[in-house]
From Swiss-Prot:
It is found in: Nucleus. Expressed only within the CNS, where its expression is restricted to the medical habenulla, to a dispersed population of neurons in the dorsal hypothalamus, and to subsets of ganglion and amacrine cells in the retina. This is POU domain, class 6, transcription factor 2. Residues 607-666 bind DNA. Probable transcription factor likely to be involved in early steps in the differentiation of amacrine and ganglion cells. Recognizes and binds to the DNA sequence 5'-ATGCAAAT-3'. Isoform 1 does not bind DNA. GO terms for cellular component: chromatin; nucleus. GO terms for biological process: central nervous system development; ganglion mother cell fate determination; regulation of DNA-templated transcription; regulation of transcription by RNA polymerase II; visual perception. Residues 186-195, 211-220, 239-280, 438-461 have a biased composition (Low complexity). Residues 196-210, 221-238 have a biased composition (Pro residues). GO terms for molecular function: DNA-binding transcription factor activity; DNA-binding transcription factor activity, RNA polymerase II-specific; RNA polymerase II cis-regulatory region sequence-specific DNA binding. It is linked to Hereditary susceptibility to Wilms tumor 5: Pediatric malignancy of kidney and one of the most common solid cancers in childhood. CDD domains: homeodomain. The lineage of its organism: Eukaryota, Metazoa, Chordata, Craniata, Vertebrata.
Length: 691
């Protein structure tokens, strides 16, 4: 433990006012009067509680307190104000890493060593009750990296640094079990502290387990100093909250930002090289906590960005926020998400030119902009439609994809199908949880791929819905699936009993009911997916263009009614037409086969050439020529045809079929027997050479 505490990464600099607050806290907790000690003496009371809490199995044993006698000058006015306005809070074991430690930790975990990452950054912020139950709001900086983050360190002293969610690290999966244990230990510690609260923390009740999960979830992203912006936003609102203490869950992030308000630029430059000396298991337990907001299923869905806009208006004009943003280069779009990981809006990164006195007006600075189009999801976390303006456009895919198959207990749950809370870059955030996900794609691009690979129950065929135990006996879009299945089975039996083929039925329907009910609509699977999610005008244009191109309009309909390869709505539409036609066909059949033939029409005769039969002698000659040359010339094929007394076209087709059969054989052997594929390679080469 002593070696760990001597690490420069952990024993860093801290402002004197904050140290004095910590010293007063420790003096009250330990029953000792050491509030007026020097900076060098303050290190002992800060470190003592950490060692004493090791027996409680808390995450504090992995982190040391920060203190350094090098900072002896009084703090800046902002630091004085922070120490004066914020009442004392327990300092003991805080499961946080500072910005410097996070940056070096990422460099130590990621392959390659140097911090050359370019991954989205999630910055959590809570706005003192103005978000209406939105815990765990996260600010995402998709284009940030460790290079353009270094300029933000200077703003850390003024605005403070909050915790970051270092998701998408390779160490996440390997440390998952340790992180779960740390979470459990933290909850146990909180319960113990609630049972025995210190006398000086009466105004700061312990937060619910949800708040620590936020603080642990957020220390996980490679660009720590991006946190100054939200951290500087927080001090105005949480200050009054600490005095009133109406929402304990929002105290914890503020105390974390106070903790990380300590690092200075000199500390940033000196500490990163020391971090890799710690193993990932010891250096990143709390930062690498899995994305807990995905597990918080009790909070309501944030489908409106107005709440976030109201919250941001109170802190948009923060001078520290503007100073921090002025140092960002290459960071443009940001995303505001709630505790469920759902995007509720965007924030443009623009420094505020106005002074901090204009904070009350909220007219300048940052504004949350709602994202459109938005994605409509169901309770299983599947995207079922996109919302553009007032239109809901279903997303079609017969397979269906669950958006967040992360780990057990980490799947994203959506409250209802009617709530719209995800924006165009939902796929980007969801992919953050995958340790092997690539962040090179833009959020909109991710969303388009996610939406194109998602499905809704209305787009699935009847056969797929019937095979699903959850929907087999139910109704989809008001259509009884069991009734459709029974009708399709009976229709096929009735058709066969009349001696009719599917082609005949299609021709008859096309003649009597129109081309939309041709064989293509009943028997064959040919569909234009755009028919489902294009606007009505686009559908009409598509149909008109298909008619102009002499294409069957029935191709626009889902098909294969008899095999249930058709959507419920289309099946419900075509069912009465088939029933009416079949009843008339059966009536004509009872009146006489001639009447049925007149009703259906004769099937067009197809002239087919007689299949050629090769004699064994002819096959022997053909195989001998094929072994010599698989691609004979036209003159050679003519000579072979004259020699065998066959048509030249017959010989040409035989060589084509023989070559294709050889390719299929080689391909099949390579797939099923890799060991035997090696001797066949010279054969293939020789064949190609001869050709």
């Amino acid at each position: 433990m002593s070696a760990l505490l001597q690490d420069p990464m952990i024993a860093g600099q801290v402002s004197k006012p904050l140290l004095s607050v910590r010293s007063e806290m420790n003096a009250e907790l330990r029953g000792e009067d050491k509030a007026a000690t020097s900076d060098s003496e303050l290190n002992e009371p800060l470190l003592a509680p950490v060692e004493s809490n090791d027996s409680e199995d808390t995450p504090s044993k992995l982190f040391g307190a920060r203190g350094n006698p090098a900072l002896s000058d009084p703090g800046t006015p902002d630091q004085h104000q922070a120490s004066q306005t914020h009442p004392p809070f327990p300092v003991g074991p805080q499961p946080l890493l500072t910005a410097q430690q996070l940056a070096s930790a990422v460099a130590g975990v990621m392959p390659g060593g140097p911090p050359a990452l370019n991954q989205p950054i999630l910055i959590p912020f809570n706005m003192a009750g103005q978000l209406g139950g939105q815990q765990g709001l996260v600010l995402t900086l998709p284009t940030a990296n460790l290079t353009n983050i270094q300029g933000l360190v200077a703003a850390a002293a003024a605005g403070g640094i909050m915790t970051l969610p270092l998701q998408n690290l390779q160490a996440t999966s390997s440390l998952n079990s340790q992180l779960q244990q740390l979470q459990l230990q933290l909850q146990q510690q909180q319960q113990q502290q609630q049972q025995q609260p210190p006398p000086s923390t009466n105004q700061h009740p312990q937060p619910a387990p949800q708040a620590p999960s936020q603080s642990q979830q957020q220390p996980l992203q490679p660009t720590p100093p991006q946190q100054p912006p939200p951290a500087s936003q927080q001090p105005p609102a949480p200050t009054s909250q600490l005095q009133q203490a109406p929402q304990p869950q929002q105290h914890q992030p503020h105390s974390h930002s106070q903790n990380q308000n300590q690092p200075s630029p000199t500390q940033q430059s000196s500490s990163p090289p020391q971090k890799p000396s710690q193993s990932p298991g010891h250096g990143l337990p709390s930062p690498l906590t899995p994305p807990n907001p995905l597990q918080l299923v009790n909070n309501p869905l944030a489908s409106q960005a107005a709440a976030a806009a109201a919250a941001m208006s109170s802190i948009a004009s923060s001078q520290a926020f503007g100073n921090a943003l002025s140092s960002l280069q290459g960071v443009t779009g940001q995303l505001v998400t709630n505790a469920q990981g759902q995007i509720i809006g965007t924030i443009p990164l623009m420094p505020n030119p106005g002074p901090s006195s204009q904070a009350a007006s909220g007219t300048q600075g940052l504004q949350v902009q709602p994202i459109t189009p938005q994605l409509l999801t169901n309770a299983q976390g599947q995207i079922i439609a996109t919302v553009i303006g007032n239109q809901i456009l279903p997303v079609i895919n017969t397979q269906g994809i669950t958006l967040s198959p992360i780990k057990p207990g980490q799947q994203l749950h959506q409250p209802s199908q009617t709530s719209v809370g995800q924006a165009a870059s939902q796929g980007n955030l969801l992919h953050l949880a995958h340790s092997q996900a690539s962040m090179s794609q833009s959020p909109v691009r991710q969303a388009s791929s996610s939406s194109s690979s998602s499905s809704s129950s209305s787009a699935l065929s009847v056969g797929q819905l019937v095979s699903n135990p959850q929907t087999a006996a139910g109704e989809v879009d008001g259509v009884n699936l069991e009734e459709i299945r029974e009708f399709a089975k009976a229709f096929k039996i009735r058709r066969l009993s009349l001696g009719l083929t599917q082609t005949q039925v299609g021709q008859a329907l096309s003649a009597t009911e129109g081309p939309a009910y041709s064989q293509s609509a009943i028997c064959r699977h040919t569909i234009l997916r755009s028919h489902f999610f294009l606007p009505q005008e686009a559908q009409e244009n598509t149909i008109a263009s298909s008619l102009t191109a002499k294409l069957n309009p029935g191709l626009l309909y889902p098909a294969r009614f008899e095999k249930l390869d058709i959507t419920p709505k289309s099946a419900q539409k075509i069912k009465p037409v088939l029933e009416r036609w079949m009843a008339e066909a059966e009536a004509r059949h009872r009146a006489g086969m001639q009447n049925l033939t007149e009703f259906i029409g004769s099937e067009p005769s197809k002239k087919r050439k007689r299949r050629t039969s090769f004699t064994p002698q002819a096959l022997e000659i053909l195989n001998a020529h094929f072994e010599k040359n698989t691609h004979p010339s036209g003159q050679e094929m003519t000579e072979i045809a004259e020699k065998l007394n066959y048509d030249r076209e017959v010989v040409r087709v035989w060589f084509c079929n023989k070559r294709q059969a050889l390719k299929n054989t080689i391909k099949r052997l390579k797939q099923h027997e890799p060991a035997t594929a090696v001797p066949l390679e010279p054969l293939t080469d020789s064949l190609e050479e001869n050709s």
